[in-house]
From Swiss-Prot:
Descriptive protein name: DNA polymerase IV
EC number, as in UniProt: 2.7.7.7
Cofactor: Mg(2+)
Provenance organism: Shewanella woodyi (strain ATCC 51908 / MS32)
Subunit description: Monomer.
UniProt enzyme class: transferase
Length: 364
């Protein structure tokens, strides 16, 4: 397989929500802070600054547990309207350099600068310029990864944080990828990482030597993706109009619940809100599955899904009942429902996919 090599920049804002709060409220600087819900309402941390991370505080951690790790932690309520406003400023900066922008969230995006003529066409210099402009306009710092393919750019953006950047040039891919932990590959979480470790695979180099047929047999379609990523191959183009893949709603409960009847008391509001969100953000889109998610009081979670072409309230309740079979006496602290959205043809990637290594002057 011939790799599609481009000049990809992955921009990742540093502690974004927390950084905005420290910018707007200077008295918070130098103190451990986290943006998230109150502990007495069983809130969850959205993000935290580096001072808090030094105590082990992390995103998606229960606020109460975070306070046990860091008793002096300052919990700040989120201001989503402000974060969205600043994110729009950042995207305006991206647009000065390329139209090929794929936002991943408010604080993260891929940029394809292959055709950009600014900064002598150097992706490294373009990333530096973008980061400098972000700081001048917003007062916030960003980190960047520069590479010929998307997933390596994302990996690279994490290697010189905060307020730094890392470059992986085409001739570096082979040596860089050999020692890269498989857990750095997007999609390889704790469960898949453990499965790979159980067969003796922890690095991309080790996976390269493993029989491809066995990987595909064990991991199916994702096995093929693993084989490609372990060789530094990622043919995905930047998708400026990236389709939403799912719509969901969940709630963290004020108190643990334990029975199916108690869950039934929560479901109607969730399903109603899901329908409203579908109308707002996925109107006209077909669905391909329904999902129910539970998080227990030991913070482990389970999801059950079923293929579905049309949203069915009855199916949500059936999936809920199946989910509770995994409860094992644990209290339920979070309940969620979601739908997967069927893909639509994306005509914007065809032109981008025509760019091949032989056609590029890759000045990194």
């Amino acid at each position: 397989m011939k790799n599609i090599l481009r000049k990809i920049i992955h921009i990742d804002m540093d502690c974004y929500f927390a950084a905005v709060e420290m910018r707007d409220f200077p008295e918070l600087r130098g103190k451990p802070i986290a943006v998230g819900g109150r502990s007495d309402r069983r809130g969850v941390i959205s993000t935290c600054n580096y001072e808090a991370r030094a105590f082990g505080v992390r995103s998606a951690m229960a606020s109460g547990y975070a306070l046990k790790l860091c008793p002096d932690l300052i919990l700040v309520p989120g201001r989503m309207s402000v974060y969205k406003e600043v994110s729009a400023q950042i995207r305006d900066i991206f647009a000065r350099y390329t139209d090929l922008i794929e936002p991943l969230s408010l604080d993260e995006a891929y940029l394809d600068v292959t055709e950009c003529k600014q900064c002598q066409g150097s992706a490294t210099l373009i990333a530096q310029a973008i980061r400098q402009e972000i700081f001048e306009v917003t007062g916030l710092t960003a980190s960047a990864g520069i590479a010929p393919v998307k997933f390596l750019a994302k990996v690279a953006s994490d290697l010189n944080k905060p307020n730094g950047q890392y470059v992986i040039t085409p001739d570096m891919i082979s040596s860089f990828i050999t020692t890269l932990p498989l857990t750095k590959i997007p999609g390889v979480g704790k469960v898949t990482g453990k499965k790979l470790e159980d067969i003796g695979l922890t690095t991309c180099g080790e996976l390269q030597a493993y029989p491809k047929s066995e990987l595909i047999e064990r991991f199916g379609k994702f096995g093929k993706i693993l084989i490609e990523r372990a060789q530094g191959i990622d043919e995905r183009a930047i998708s400026p109009h990236r389709e939403r893949k799912s719509v969901g709603v969940e709630t963290t409960l004020a108190k643990d619940i334990y029975t199916l009847e108690q869950c039934h008391g929560v479901m109607p509001q969730l399903i109603q809100e899901l329908g409203a969100r579908m109308s707002r953000s996925a109107k006209g889109r077909s669905i391909n599955k329904q999902v129910v998610k539970l998080k227990f009081n030991d913070f482990k979670q389970t999801t059950i899904e079923h293929r579905s072409d049309e949203m069915s309230v009855k199916l949500f309740y059936e999936l809920l009942a199946q989910s509770l079979e995994r409860q094992q006496g644990r209290g339920i602290r979070l309940l969620g429902v979601s739908v997967g959205l069927a893909c639509q043809a994306d005509s914007n990637t065809a032109k981008d996919n025509q760019v091949r290594e032989s056609q590029l002057d890759l000045g990194f």
